[in-house]
Amino acid sequence: MTTRFTHFRRAAAGLAASSVLLLGTLTPQATAADTGTAPPPVLTGAQLAASWTAPLSTRDRYVVDANGDRFKLKSGNWAGAQGTWQGSGDVGDVANHQARQMSHNIPLGLDRKPIADILADFHALGLNSIRLPFANAMIRDTSVVPDSAVAANPQLKGKTPLQVLDAVVAAMTTDGFAVILNNHTTSYRFCCGLDGNERWNSGQSTQQWIDDWVFLAKRYKDDKRVVGADLRNEVRRDTWNDPNWGWGNDHDLNKAMEEAGNKILQAVPDLLVIMEGINWQGIPTDLTPHGRPTLTPVATLSNTLIRSDKLVYAAHFYGYTGPNHTGATGTGETHDPRYEEFTPAQLAQVVDDQALFVTRSGQHFTAPVWISEFGAGGRGEIDAKERAWFTNFTDILVRNDTDFAIWPLVGWTDANGTPQDTWAMVNYSANGARLGVMDAGDWRTTDWNKLVGAPGRTGRIAPAPRWNMLNLDYADYNVSATMLAKPDWSPGNRKGNCPDTQRLVGLGRSDSRGLCTDAGQPAKASGPWTVVTDERYVSGGDWASGYDKRQCPDGSFAVGYSVRGNAMSALLCAPATASLPTTGRVLWFDKADNRPATGGSTASDWAPGHYKGQCADTEYVAGVAFTWKWNHGGVPDALLCRPLG
């Protein structure tokens, strides 16, 4: 589901499809000879369950299971619980629902097919995980779904939408699937543009949104195969305001996702936290600035969570949209290129620029990227550009070994056997007959089999060092679980604390940003951490003559700092279990960047426009020097870097 302002192409594609299949007719399954690509191996639920161990986490650019083995997200979107009503007309009239499919605010298809059979079809597609969209409205919806909405699953009669979701989640995880919950909308409305669901705080407060997430996280915490929280779908401009990434206000998606992710992890530490970038900014005319930032802002402002092994970034791509194109036809359309109009090489470059760059190792932003929505119309799709785009895009996913989720999984066929939403991977008739991408006659089969069966990295993923940034631009940035449980350690100042598994390794000058790492991380002792507000711990001589200094006690290393304005205030130090060297070097960055030539996050900028000082990966920060002389304003000018051993 992607932002568009007028023309909903995916729904229209479903209406344009033609088919001679009769209601209830079973269709032959596609073969390798039909497609040129062998279909994926079909695992039973027991086989899928045995193939991975929950919970999931991340190492470098990969999602891994509890054993450290690669778990590539081969996913699909089972839509419906986010609502299908299109916002006008009688909500009880199926004609007013997306592709004339009324979900009754539960996953589509439960009226037509037993859930076990639906999941068997998901297995046949080669999936191992399901993205499950929902609306915040579902959480407080006490209405009972009509019996007709669960006709093929009578065990679900008499349940509310949330209770139906409970049963669906339990069925999926029992059958071996990993489940990722996706907050798709606030209200039960489909879909996009100016629909009242533009931001996480559209129609609700940010606090309510976070509370809802914590509620759901706790609801499913005992089911370890509920593996992730996909925080919000396609954040975009509303009538008056753009979302932003890092302004510190109520429209700041970076700030909101940071807060929500940490609250979720405090409640349920096992979950992956999935953050999608900004889907649209600006007014789409040829005379006004506009565009689709996606993950590009992450290059200079990434997120750091209290569990640094839990962050996954996400992005959406559809052929009829573009980096600066809404996907609209008519009102809201500009003359910017659509993704489907790029050459294969151009498309690969723009997808890397907008999203896949995040998978580069050793940077402050390094994380897995999940393309959590993409797709194309199947049967009846005659647009050559659309078809070529799908082939080219799936080629990109294969080459980059990228995690993915196709949109959508389930749709309906009408009384003539014609798919109502040709984008769906499987469509069911009223009596449950299936017409899917695994059946003959769908042009997407070759590309789908190519994608889901592509070779990629498997087996154990070795732990890799991490670098994560701290952003004190507007407020505290406390991602230490230890310090979050303690009183304010530097009242009246903005504070930045590294995750408990990391230490401070760099500071920005005049912008209050910091860099943390776990490269060569010394073990922390169990003793108290020290807040340094003066020079009482300075040792080894006056290493920055004429400058004020904050230095950790010998045997400890910096894990946090505080500032007033951008001026240095205090240093937070944690004790090491083993002795640390007390010799070192002074690293000045008052006149230029002073960063290692090689090593962590040296190819990325975590404090753009400001000088940065960064100790080597084999060092720890033992002290910071600053001065109020010469109009320096008390900002950090030098680091005392000491070797780890």
Which positions does each model-derived feature cover?
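Surface-exposed, active-site-proximal loop segments in enzymatic domains
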Residues: 88-94, 98-103, 136-161, 189-204, ...
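Active-site-proximal beta-strand/loop segments in catalytic clefts of secreted hydrolases
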Residues: 76-81, 133-137, 182-186, 230-235, ...
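Lectin-type carbohydrate-recognition ectodomains
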Residues: 469-645
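Extracellular glycoside hydrolase catalytic/binding regions
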Residues: 55, 98-107, 111, 201-203, ...
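N-terminal carbohydrate-binding accessory modules
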Residues: 32-129
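Secretory targeting and sorting signals
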Residues: 1-34
